[in-house]
Curated annotation (Swiss-Prot):
Gene: foxh1
Motif (Fast/FoxH1 motif 1 (FM1)): 357-361
PROSITE patterns: FORK_HEAD_2, FORK_HEAD_3
Organism this protein belongs to: Danio rerio
Single GO MF descriptor: RNA polymerase II transcription regulatory region sequence-specific DNA binding
Protein name: Forkhead box protein H1
Annotated region (Disordered), positions in chain: 36-56, 211-246, 261-360
Length: 472
């Protein structure tokens, strides 16, 4: 007995041709329908037909799932192509932005106008004509132009109708003196780096046509914050015209001037004689020196007067003014070239007597050792220098005659006096230990009431012939 397998659906699996989706579904439905009809006809005669129908159905579903997975993988590419071909286009085309600031472009179009003023609509039109970036439907740059016109003070609004300050149609002008020069240069952008010959490096020549650029001569902001240094040609008005001019700000004398009182402003001029520099012939004063100094009238201490105070303030000022004029002519470049010693002083430096030692206002360091109260100003404990003239605190009242006489020591009496030679050997250690602060060595040497001086002959033997003029 020969066994018969079902129809072609059982003997061979159904063949599905891969094609378009509609045709594949049509054939699949037809095969499924054909298998169902065969299964219903031969169910009784062949029980294996039911199994063949299930195999046919499962095979078709598997192939259909494979197709759907394949279609899913190909779907996004097909959708992207469809969207790209039928997508919405942009409503404007962007050109590369020019490598200049809005301030530079606005100032350039205003300065190149015939009347040097434009309205807002004219500015927008001129900028869009020069640069294609501002053409098309892109309108965002117009707000940037309005912002720059109202932000920078170099743009000035000229009212079309003064009675309507908020009206439209006003003109805009440029004040070239207020334009920041750093904003006129070409910016470092991708367009400017591609071809540097297309765009000008600086728009200043197109803006300052017929104008001078005053901002170039102005100093930088860090330099403008520094105080101006006084010069010989233009001294500041607050400066004393009679004070000596110093070339170096950090000179020692410039630091000393800040510590000295106003009455001793010309102290450095008076001590120039110690360096042995003679006065120029053209700066010698023709007027005789005044016998007394005006500053001595209000002085009660000998230490407030310089030991070299043999010249009045007025004479020194006159000499200083002459020295200034000669210094401007390029005669000398020394810090003390504006001053000269008085004509009656000798430039030859001899042995310094004790009363010519430096005081608290001199350039030299004064002794600052403080003596005990029992040793102050008694004149006896340290050295018996009775012949040295001394103006003490407990002496007689100073009269007008004391201020006329010795140029080096203006408080001596004007009459003839006898002079005794002081001892040549002096104990400087004991002298320095007993000197009060800000006082000279001479202030602590003599007694309070001794005003007798050595004879001229003995005094000349010690100090040489240069001091013979002290005898009256």
């Amino acid at each position: 007995m020969t066994k018969h397998w079902g129809g072609p659906g059982l003997l061979a699996p159904p063949v599905i041709t891969v094609g378009e989706g509609a045709q594949r579904d049509h054939h699949l439905d037809c095969r499924i329908g054909y298998s169902s009809s065969k299964r219903s006809c031969h169910r009784s005669s062949n029980p294996l037909l039911e199994l063949g129908g299930r195999l046919d159905k499962s095979t078709g579903m598997a192939q259909d799932s494979c197709y759907r997975a394949k279609a899913t993988n190909q779907g996004p590419w097909e959708l992207q192509d469809g969207n790209s071909s039928g997508g919405k286009k942009k409503n404007y085309q962007r050109y590369p932005k020019p490598p200049y600031s809005y301030l530079a472009m606005i100032a350039m179009v205003i300065q190149n106008s015939p009347e040097k003023k434009l309205t807002l609509s004219e500015i927008l039109k001129e900028i869009s004509t020069l640069f294609p970036f501002f053409k098309g439907n892109y309108k965002g740059w117009r707000d940037s132009v309005r912002h720059n016109l109202s932000s920078y003070d170099c743009f000035v609004k000229v009212l079309k109708d003064p009675g309507k300050p908020q009206g439209k149609g006003n003109f805009w002008t440029v004040e070239v003196n207020r334009i920041p020069l750093e904003l006129l240069k070409r910016q470092n952008t991708a367009v400017s780096r591609q071809d540097e010959t297309i765009f000008a490096q600086d728009l200043a020549p197109y803006i300052f046509q017929g104008y001078s650029q005053p901002n170039k001569s102005k100093p930088l902001p860090p330099e403008s914050s520094l105080p101006p240094v006084p010069t010989r040609q233009s001294p500041p008005p607050s400066e004393d015209p009679y004070r000596p001019k110093l070339d170096s700000t950090f000179a020692i004398d410039s630091l000393l001037h800040s510590l000295r009182p106003a009455s001793s402003a010309g102290e450095g001029l008076r001590e120039r004689e110690s360096w042995g520099v003679g006065p120029p012939p053209h700066t010698r004063s023709t007027t005789p020196p005044r016998p007394c100094n005006a500053s001595y009238n209000g002085s009660s201490s000998a230490s407030s007067v310089s030991p070299a105070s043999d010249f009045s303030d007025e004479d020194w000022r006159g000499v200083t003014v002459v020295g200034k004029r000669s210094g401007d002519r390029g005669i000398t470049s020394d810090a003390y070239s504006d001053s000269c010693p008085p004509p009656n002083k000798s430039s030859k430096r001899g042995n310094t007597p004790p009363w010519e030692l430096p005081t608290s206002y001199a350039k030299y360091t004064p002794p600052n050792a403080v003596a005990p109260p029992s040793m102050r100003f008694n004149g006896n404990p340290f050295m018996p220098l009775g012949g040295i003239p001394f103006y003490g605190y407990g002496g007689a009242h100073v009269t007008t005659s004391h201020l006329i006489g010795h140029p080096y020591w203006p408080i001596l009496p004007s009459g003839p006096v006898s002079i005794q030679a002081p001892p040549l050997l002096m104990d400087l250690d004991s002298m320095l230990q007993s000197v009060p602060p800000n006082k000279s060595v001479f202030d602590a040497l003599g007694s309070n009431n001794q005003t007798v001086h050595p004879s001229p002959n003995q005094y000349a033997l010690q100090n040489g012939p240069s001091l013979c003029k002290y005898s009256l």
